[in-house]
Amino acid sequence: MGRAFEYRRASKEARWGKMSKLFPKLGKSITMAAKEGGPDPDMNPKLRTAIATAKAQNMPKDNIDAAIKRASGKDAADIKIIHYDGKAPHGALLIIECASDNSTRTVANIKSILNKGNGEFLPNGSLTFMFSRKSVFEVEYPKRDLEAVELDLIDYGLTEMEENEFENDKGEIEKTLTIYGDYESFGTLNEGIEKLGLTIKSGNLQFVANNFVEFADEDLKEIEELIEKLEDDDDVQAVYTNIK
C-alpha cells in the first residue's frame, strides 16, 4: 500500500495547504469524539487521537479547548455522522464521510458536486464490500527495531504496518509508520501505541479500499478536482477512495 499512501499524503497536503476550512474540520472531529466518549482525553482514546491529529496540524490550543466544550452544546447534539457512496470520473470509487446537522442539505450538496464533476451518486451501501472499516494511525518513525514494534503491537490489535517515505513541506525526506487494525481495535491499538512511546501524527477510523486501482495522470487530475470540491464542503469530513 506504499504508493496508495504516497497518493493520499500528496493529495491531502496539497488540498489542506490551501484549504481555509482545515481547523473547523479538525475541530468538528474533536467535538464528535468528545460527544461520543466524553470530554476527558485520558478516558477517551478517540478524543486523545483527534487532539493529537489537530496538534500535528498546528491547531491552537484555544481552538481545541473550544471544540471539546462544544460537545455538550445543543449544536453538537444535532450533528450526525453520515456516509455517502459515489463514483468519480473514470470509475474511481468514493466513500464520503460527513458530519451534519441537516442531512437534507448535505445530500443535496453532495449530489450537486458529484453531478457537476462528472461523478455519480450511488445508493447507500453500494460500496460496502469494496472497502473495509479500519483503525488507522500514522506515527513518527520509531527509533527502535521495527520488528519488535510490530510484535508488541500485534498484542494490541495490529493487522498491518507500513513504512512511508516522502518529501515534507520543508523539502526534507521524512519517514513515518502507518499502523492498521480492525475497526473494533481502535482503543486497544491506541493504548499500545502510547505505551510504546510512539508519537501519533494522526489517527482515526477510515474506509480502506480492498483493492486499489491505478489511474493515468490526466484522469487523476479530473478525479482530484472533484475530490477537492467535495472536501471544500463544510459538512464533508473526509473522502476515501480506491486510488493507488
UniProtKB/Swiss-Prot annotation:
Gene Ontology biological process terms, A to Z: regulation of DNA-templated transcription
Main location: cytoplasm
Superkingdom, taxonomy of origin: Bacteria
Gene Ontology cellular component terms for the protein in this record: cytosol
Keyword annotations: Cytoplasm, DNA-binding, Transcription, Transcription regulation
Keyword Transmembrane: no
Compartments (UniProt record): Cytoplasm
Secretion signal, residue range per the UniProt entry: none
Any one GO MF annotation of this record: DNA binding
Record PANTHER family: TRANSCRIPTIONAL REGULATORY PROTEIN YEBC-RELATED, TRANSLATIONAL ACTIVATOR OF CYTOCHROME C OXIDASE 1
Membership in a protein family: Belongs to the TACO1 family.
UniProt-recorded name of the protein: Probable transcriptional regulatory protein CHAB381_1426
Annotated organism of origin: Campylobacter hominis (strain ATCC BAA-381 / DSM 21671 / CCUG 45161 / LMG 19568 / NCTC 13146 / CH001A)
Lineage, top ranks: Bacteria, Pseudomonadati, Campylobacterota, Epsilonproteobacteria, Campylobacterales
